[in-house]
Every structure is written in structure tokens, then in C-alpha cells.
Amino acid sequence: MKQFLDFLPLVVFFAFYKLYDIYAATTALIVATAVVLIYSWVRYRKVEKMALITFVLVAVFGGLTIFFHNDEFIKWKVTVIYALFAGALLFSQWVMKKPLIQRMLGKELSLPQQVWSRLNLAWAVFFILCGLANIYIAFWLPQNIWVNFKVFGLTALTLVFTLLSGIYIYRHMPQDDHH
């Protein structure tokens, strides 16, 4: 259910883009993200930090897009979010000395420190590359291609990278944890 809720604003954005335009889609994205955030609070009495950060960025960049009637703001939001994610991962590893991935999954999984570090770094690089790809596609290709990339391309890339991360984790788990 949670994954569906996380994906819902993206579906709404895509539908409104196809039916109307980027500005209606951006407005719908802001509203849908707010509704999901409110629903999460009412249903679970908890809002995840990433969801809150995402909402703030959607509201700010989306609001600027609508106010200035300029789609460049909403296009930059994707790269800014990925840059923040990558920055948080790298900061946790290099400054806090405990990878963020380990902080998030360490209670459920027992992995060697080197594996946590590699996984954390891999996700940081993934987010950086996705952010760079977004810049290229958003500003060098037609808007409809960017919308499709944002909705389907980045989602597919994230699912594939999550699967690859799962395989990597499984290969490095202590033998007792495999069963």
C-alpha cells in the first residue's frame, strides 16, 4: 500500500499532463503529494522524512513553475531531489562514518561494513547519474520525452537498481541469514 501511495502523485502528474498541460500536471502533483502526506499522517500517525522533504520541494518548485509559468522549475526539482539524496548518502559515509543505507536497513540486515559502504556509495552514484540524465533530458529534449522519462524511465531505473542492490545484499549476507 505504501509503495502505491508513493507512486500515486507521479501517476496523477502523468495523467494531468496527458489530459491538459505541464502546469495542470504540476498543480495536480502538488495536491496529490499533499493528499498522500496527509493520508500518511492520519492513517499511520507518521510522516517519513523523505516524504516531507519531497513534498516541500514539490511545493516550492511546483509553486515557482505555476507562478512564473515556466516549466524549468519543475524540471529542476528532480535533479535537486537526487542531489540531496546523493549528498545525504555521501555525508553519512564520509562525515558521520556510518552509511545512511546501514542506518536505514542495519536493524534488519547483518552485512560487513565494506558492503554497507559500497552499497551506500553505489546509491549515491546512481542518484548523481539520474540527476545528470534528468538535466540532459529535461533541457535538451522535448517536454513530452522528459515527462515520460520522469514517470517511466526513472521509475524503471530505480526498480532495476533496487533489484540489483537486493542481489548484492543477498550475495554478501552471512549464510545463517539466507534462510
UniProtKB/Swiss-Prot annotation:
It is a multi-pass membrane protein. InterPro entries: YciB (IPR006008). GO terms for cellular component: plasma membrane. It is found in: Cell inner membrane. Its main location: membrane. The chain crosses the membrane at residues 22-42, 50-70, 76-96, 121-141, 149-169. The keyword DNA repair does not apply. Keywords: Cell inner membrane, Cell membrane, Membrane, Transmembrane, Transmembrane helix. Plays a role in cell envelope biogenesis, maintenance of cell envelope integrity and membrane homeostasis. Belongs to the YciB family. PANTHER family: INNER MEMBRANE-SPANNING PROTEIN YCIB, INTRACELLULAR SEPTATION PROTEIN A-RELATED. This is Inner membrane-spanning protein YciB. The gene is yciB.
